[in-house]
């Protein structure tokens, strides 16, 4: 176990951060991830990923997902073949982070 759990396609965002983060990939695709909402005891926050033609992994048009990562939020955005379509996948990669407790 162990190793780097943050790759070029993953961004680890502290749950207490409420500023707007502009994520720019090496391919030139841009996406704006915004962390909003008060942090609950479970570290529950809402991250809004606003991109051009933003689609979730189910194929539906969506611009907001709820991710709870025990104090951290993980937003995974991967650019598709076209520029106007960017797939934003929201998955709580529990296996990628060390367990607390």
Swiss-Prot record:
InterPro entries: BFDV_Orf5
Record protein name field: Uncharacterized protein ORF5
UniProt organism field: Beak and feather disease virus
């Amino acid at each position: 176990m162990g190793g780097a759990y943050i790759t070029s396609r993953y961004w680890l965002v502290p749950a207490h951060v409420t500023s707007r983060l502009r994520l720019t990939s090496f391919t030139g695709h841009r996406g704006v991830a915004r962390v909003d909402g008060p942090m609950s005891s479970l570290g529950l926050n809402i991250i809004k990923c606003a991109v051009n033609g933003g689609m979730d992994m189910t194929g539906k048009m969506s611009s907001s997902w709820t991710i709870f990562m025990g104090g951290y939020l993980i937003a995974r955005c991967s650019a598709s073949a076209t520029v106007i379509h960017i797939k934003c996948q929201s998955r709580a990669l529990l296996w990628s982070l060390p367990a607390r407790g």
